[in-house]
């Protein structure tokens, strides 16, 4: 465990060491409001995990794709090793990409997922709200599962997109269940119509397609179950000590709880620690405001590991700076005396 001294009143350790120690974790999501240091935190956590795990994959699901900027290295849809590491890889994907893009890029792989539906069935499938994005998410999960990494860290999009991203498995399950119900009611008629029009691509019939979709539903159901298992999945909230960020964090934690997704760690970034002899009035005023919201965080989340990270004088970009920042996730920053 960390060398930090834990107070005698059993306040939880102000580090992410417990996440590193939890060897059963398979999925780790890092999320928060835009501009709070979410990508820096996810990169830093992945670096720490790479010290204790055989293989780590860092995935950006944020359309802004800041991983490339953080490490100074270009990443894309295929996982590639991060320079200077032999067990830490990264990739940048967009789970909200249209299914048309996926089908154009996926070829046979898309067929295997059950996407060879033909125009009519595509229209039927995508008439269900959220299924377009959920199918894209399914493709992402299939890629990730096939890569066999020991632990996967998701650098998620800003708060609203994060929560929608985590709903995808449930949305897809409901959508496929609805399609299955429709097929049982209208299957014979649809088969007749499709037969008259030359059938589905590859000589498939409707039953073949629905069988593939049922297989897909089972895969998504399995992942959904894993997401709700605290031994396998956790969510790290990132915020700053300001009202709007704290409000977003509380809303996010409530929603995560409603999805039965574990969350027990909060990283508070960009904290000011002016020395007692500081002549910076703005720094002192901001520190006073931050202390107010830090106190609220400690009261609201007394059963969370709350990590306090300082505002640095330089951007945290590049391997060396990220490694220094990541060290403070497990060895708490010691501020000067105020």
Swiss-Prot record:
Residue numbers binding Zn(2+): 280, 283
Binding positions for ATP per the UniProt entry: 33-40, 242, 269
EC code: 3.6.-.-
Keywords, ordered alphabetically: ATP-binding, Cytoplasm, Endoplasmic reticulum, Hydrolase, Metal-binding, Nucleotide-binding, Transport, Zinc
Localization, UniProt: Cytoplasm; Endoplasmic reticulum
Origin: domain of life: Eukaryota
Active site: 62
GO molecular function: ATP binding; ATP hydrolysis activity; guanyl-nucleotide exchange factor activity; identical protein binding; metal ion binding; protein folding chaperone; unfolded protein binding
Main location: cytoplasm
GO cellular component terms given for this protein: GET complex
InterPro entries from the UniProt entry: Anion-transp_ATPase-like_dom, ATPase_ArsA/GET3, ATPase_ArsA/GET3_euk, P-loop_NTPase
A Gene Ontology BP annotation from the UniProt entry: response to heat
Family: Belongs to the arsA ATPase family.
SUBUNIT field: Homodimer.
Function of the protein: ATPase required for the post-translational delivery of tail-anchored (TA) proteins to the endoplasmic reticulum. Recognizes and selectively binds the transmembrane domain of TA proteins in the cytosol. This complex then targets to the endoplasmic reticulum by membrane-bound receptors, where the tail-anchored protein is released for insertion. This process is regulated by ATP binding and hydrolysis. ATP binding drives the homodimer towards the closed dimer state, facilitating recognition of newly synthesized TA membrane proteins. ATP hydrolysis is required for insertion.
Family matches, as PANTHER family: ARSENICAL PUMP-DRIVING ATPASE ARSENITE-TRANSLOCATING ATPASE, ATPASE GET3
Protein name (database record): ATPase GET3
Lineage: Eukaryota, Fungi, Dikarya, Ascomycota, Pezizomycotina
């Amino acid at each position: 465990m960390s060398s930090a001294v834990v107070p005698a009143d059993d306040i939880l350790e102000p580090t992410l060491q417990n996440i590193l120690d939890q060897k059963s974790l398979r999925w780790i999501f890092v999320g928060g409001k835009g501009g709070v240091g979410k990508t820096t935190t996810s990169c830093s956590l992945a670096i720490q995990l790479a010290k204790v795990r055989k293989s780590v994959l860092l995935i950006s699901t944020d359309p802004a794709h800041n991983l490339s900027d953080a490490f100074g290295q270009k990443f894309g849809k295929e996982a590639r090793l991060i320079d200077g590491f032999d067990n830490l890889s990264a990739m940048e994907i967009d789970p909200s990409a249209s299914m048309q893009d996926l089908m154009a890029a996926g070829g046979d792989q898309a067929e295997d997922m059950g996407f060879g539906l033909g125009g009519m069935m595509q229209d039927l499938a995508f008439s269900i709200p959220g299924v377009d994005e959920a199918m894209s998410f399914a493709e992402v999960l299939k890629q990730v599962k096939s890569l066999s990494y020991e632990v996967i860290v998701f650098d998620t999009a800003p708060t609203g997109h994060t929560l929608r991203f985590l709903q995808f498995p449930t949305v897809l399950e409901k959508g496929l269940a609805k399609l299955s119900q429709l097929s049982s009611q209208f299957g014979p008629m649809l088969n007749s119509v499709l037969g008259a029009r030359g059938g589905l691509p590859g000589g498939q019939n409707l039953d073949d397609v629905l069988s593939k979709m049922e297989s897909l539903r089972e895969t998504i159901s399995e992942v959904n179950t894993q997401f709700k298992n605290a031994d396998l999945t956790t969510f790290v909230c990132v915020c700053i000590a300001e009202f709007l960020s704290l409000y977003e964090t509380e809303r996010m934690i409530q929603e995560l709880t409603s999805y039965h997704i574990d969350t027990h760690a909060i990283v508070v970034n960009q904290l000011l620690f002016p020395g007692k002899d500081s002549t910076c009035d703005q720094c002192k005023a901001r520190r006073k405001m931050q202390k107010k919201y830090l106190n609220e965080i400690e009261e609201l989340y007394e059963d969370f590991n709350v990590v306090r990270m300082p505002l640095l004088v330089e951007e945290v970009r590049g391997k060396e700076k990220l490694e220094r920042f990541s060290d403070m996730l497990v060895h708490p920053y010691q501020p000067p005396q105020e």
